[in-house]
Amino acid sequence: MIIIFRLFLIFFSINAYSLEIIRDPFFENYFKNIQLKYNLPVANVYIVDHNEINAFVLGNNVYFTKGIIKNIKQEDVLKSIYFHEVGHIYHNHYNSKKLEINSSKKNKVYNNILSIGAAIFTGNANIGIATNLSIDQSILNNLSTNSIRHEIEADNFMLENISKNKINTSDLIDFFDNLPESNNRFYKSHPTNKNRVISLKKYTNFKKNKNSINFEWLKAKYGRNSNIFEFNNFFSSLNKGIVNITDAKSIDDINYANYEIYKAGIMIDDIKQMYLNLIEVNSNPYLKIEFYNMIIDNNISEYFEIIERNKHNSEIQSEYFFYFLYGKYYNKINNKDLSNFYFCQFYKVADLKDKSDYYCNKYDINSIPKIDNSYAILK
C-alpha cells in the first residue's frame, strides 16, 4: 500500500529546549465535540505556541501548533489531520515508541515529558494558576520519529473516517501542495506529493462543508485570518487593550468573548457568573480549575463546598495543577496540614526538590484523611 503522507508524531527540528502549551478551554472543548460527533477515541487536545506548521501525539494527547491553525483555511482539513493524529492514539503508537526508546536508552526517563514553566515558581506559594506548561524538546525529538508501519495505520484510520463521514479532500490536497519548503523535511522518507494526491482524489467528490462559527473563532484567535472579519478585529483590538464586544456578537456564546476579555487582564462585570455560564456548556476541567482559583482568590466562600466536592472528580485530578489548587484552597481555609500535604504532592510532580522537601516535612500524616492520602504521589 502507498503511504499517503507522514502526518505527525513528526520530528521537531526547532532550536528550542521546550514548547509552550497554551491551555484554552474553548479550543479543547472544540475537539471534544468533534470526538463526540464522529465517535472517535477519547483524546486531550492542546495548542502549542509556535509558528511551525505541525501537529503531534504524546500519550493520549494531541498537540496542534498555532502555525498549523493559522495555515488551515477549511475546517474539513483540520478534521482530516485530527483523524490521522487520533489514529496514532487508536493504535497505541506512542507507548510502542516509548518502550522502544526506553529499552535502548535505559539511563534516561521518558515518562515525565511535561515540565512546569520555571517562571511561575517565583514568589510564594500563593501564586495563581498558570496557563501553560512546556514540552521537553529533547524527549519530544526522540518520541516523535515514526515507523512506516505506524504511518500506514494512522493513514488508514484517517481515510476510513474521511470516507465514513463523507469529508471532501480537495482542500486537504491543496494544503499539502502548498506546504512551505521548510516543511518538506517531514516527508523525506515518504512518497511524493503526486502519490499522496492520487490517494486522496477519490474523496474529492463529496460535498464541501461550510466552516463552523467556532472554527472561525479559533482562526481569528490564533491566526487573525478568519473569514469572519469581525472576529479578527475583536482579537486584534483586544491585543491592544481595546474591547469591541460587538465584533464578537456572532459567536455562539458571548461568554466566550467575555472570557477572552477577562484573560487579557481587562475587568468584566460578574466574573463569577461568566464562569458559571461557561461551565454549563463546557465541562473542560481546566476551566473549572481556573474558576476555583478565582473563587479562592476572591474568597467567595459560598462556593468552597463545590471546590471540596470536586476534589474527587477524576478529570480535575488529571489536571497538572490539581495538587497546587488544593494546597492553595486548604491554605485559604486554614487547614495547614492538608495545605502542606497537597503542596508537597505538587512540587514532587514538578520535581522541585527544595520546595517539595519544605512542604513534605510540614504536615502530620496522621491528620490526613484516607481519601486524600489515596490521591498522593507519595504513599
Features from the language model and the residues they span:
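Extracytoplasmic
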Residues: 26, 40-42, 50, 57-63, ...
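Short pre-active-site segment immediately N-terminal to the catalytic Zn-binding motif
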Residues: 63-80, 144-146
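Hydrophobic or amphipathic, alpha-helical segments that drive membrane association/targeting
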Residues: 4-7, 12-60, 91, 140, ...
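Extracytoplasmic and endomembrane cell-envelope/extracellular-matrix remodeling and assembly machinery
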Residues: 21, 29, 44-45, 142, ...
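Solvent-exposed coil/turn segments that connect beta secondary-structure elements
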Residues: 50-51, 60, 67-69, 86, ...
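Catalytic Zn2+-binding segment of zinc metalloproteases
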Residues: 76, 86-103, 167
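Substrate-binding clefts and substrate-entry loops adjacent to catalytic sites
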Residues: 92, 119-146
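Post-HEXXH active-site segment of zinc metalloproteases
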Residues: 93-121, 128, 176
